[in-house]
Each structure stands twice: as structure tokens, then as C-alpha cells.
């Protein structure tokens, strides 16, 4: 994985070969020794050990107001749970006081999340429970969900938990 920072806050966390990985223009990257990177590595170690990793490292997310709103909602999805793109769209509609928001627009914002795992975009699934649209790959999405105790089989989670 590659981490990026503004020196104080995490601005990016990507799997190698991930879709939308920024090829240029990264601020401080892992090559620099930053306490934040040590903190993030420790958080990830706890996460991958199957533990509750605790509070997330400090973040600085940059994007359109719509993307930022989606990413804030992603941060509210509890470990071990999934939410549909459509449910997030409906939450945004309520917060805005009306006006349609499409699940596809939510999917676009989710897919461009610059801080994988920490901002848990892997916890968002299709309305039928399908594991679609993960920039890190569907197999990786399934592995992350299983690590959190979510039942996954045949590229989907059971509809009863969606």
C-alpha cells in the first residue's frame, strides 16, 4: 500500500495497482519518515489482525462537496456492517432536504475515495448485496469484509444483511 500525507494528516492510502491511483502530484509519501505514517501502519496492523483498530489517523480529504458528503457518510458505517449505494443516496437526499441523488453518483464518489480502508468504502454494496465497484478489486473487497466478519460468497453478501 502507498500512503500520502500533507505532513500532518493522511491524504491518501491506496493498494498497489488500485484504480484511480494518482500517478503524479502526491504530497509527502511513505519514503519520508513521518510519525503519521507510523500511526497509520499501526492502525492497519490492528485492522488486518482482525482487531478494532481504534480511532482513525487524522485525515484531510479533498474533493467536491458531494464527494466529501459521501465520504463523511462512509466513515459512519460500523465495522462488520454493509450499506447499499442506494441507502447512502437516500441519506444524502434527507440531509439536503430533498432533490434526487442517484446510487450511481454515490458509486462514483465511493470509487474515488482516496483513503482506502480508513474511509471504509469497501462496506458499500449493491442493492442486491453484490460486491460491485471497489477500486481495489472485488476480491479484495470480499477479503476486507470477511476480515470484519461479514459473510461473503459468490461475489455478494446475503440480502438479509443488506
Question: Over which residues does each language-model region extend?
Answer:
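Nucleic acid-binding interface residues in structured DNA/RNA-binding domains
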Residues: 1, 51-162
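Compact structured core domains
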Residues: 4-56
Amino acid at each position: 500500500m502507498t500512503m500520502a500525507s500533507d505532513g500532518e494528516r493522511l491524504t491518501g492510502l491506496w493498494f498497489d495497482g488500485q484504480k484511480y491511483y494518482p500517478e503524479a502530484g502526491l504530497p509527502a509519501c511513505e519514503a519520508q519518515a513521518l510519525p503519521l505514517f507510523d500511526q497509520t501502519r499501526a492502525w492497519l496492523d490492528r485492522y488486518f489482525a482482525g482487531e478494532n483498530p481504534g480511532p482513525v489517523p487524522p485525515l484531510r480529504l479533498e474533493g467536491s462537496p458531494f464527494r466529501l458528503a459521501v465520504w463523511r457518510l462512509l466513515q459512519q458505517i460500523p465495522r462488520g456492517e454493509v450499506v447499499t449505494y442506494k441507502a447512502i443516496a437516500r441519506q444524502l437526499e434527507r440531509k439536503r432536504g430533498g432533490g434526487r441523488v442517484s446510487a450511481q453518483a454515490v458509486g462514483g464518489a465511493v470509487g474515488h475515495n482516496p483513503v482506502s480502508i480508513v474511509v471504509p468504502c469497501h462496506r458499500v454494496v449493491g442493492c442486491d448485496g453484490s460486491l460491485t465497484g471497489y477500486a481495489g478489486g472485488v476480491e479484495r473487497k470480499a477479503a476486507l469484509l470477511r476480515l470484519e466478519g461479514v459473510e461473503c460468497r459468490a461475489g455478494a453478501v446475503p440480502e438479509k444483511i443488506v
